[in-house]
Amino acid sequence: MYVEIMDGFLDKNQLVRFNSVYEQGKWVDGEISGPKDKEKKNNLQNEDYDVKRLINQEIHKLFRQLSNYYNINRASDVLILKYEKDMHYNDHVDYMQMHGIRTDYTCVLNLNDDYEGGEHYIKNHKGEKTLYKLKAGDMMMYDTSQIHGVNPVIEGERRTLTFWCESAVNDIGMREALVRFNVWYHKLTDDDYDALGYKKWCELDWIRMQIMRNHVHYRD
């Protein structure tokens, strides 16, 4: 089960700006996303064109910083969601295609944390839940094929942005292996390079490039 928590994906200034835009616009019942959703979800969705345009522009700029790690082809538009008291999202699996892209990664970005309940959860193959309560500005990214949901909000209001990404790597196993390798690779320091030595570092880089040439296929 692949889950990555990115602490502080938004800094304090970005959080203020996003929340200011979030407050604007028109909120509608979240079931607008699909006719079958009424049975499983109970939330609100911001459908204001200008709000969606501004937030999408900002998110797509920020997401470019992750391209070295995740080999992303493209990202979907952002869903601007609100969960008020007692609102929730029952067990579900996201559609394999969303907004014209194949959904390989689901991304959930929290704009606040001053609420009770409302934990995002993911179920394993045994049906066991793992709960995630993100801090404001944190983002979680996980394999879209996993069963997940949102527990009822007990007090306050949960503000989130949700979007999906298409990987340039088709094979799920290779996708996760490359992410793990890339995260490790980009954390190497000058001391690590010195310890490896130039020749071994070149060999390591050659192996990485060959794997990417064979498995990473970016769209034009």
Q: Could you tell me what each predicted segment is?
A:
Residues R64-V179:
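Catalytic core of non-heme Fe(II) oxygenases with the double-stranded beta-helix
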Residues M1-I72, A177-D220:
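Non-heme Fe(II)/2-oxoglutarate
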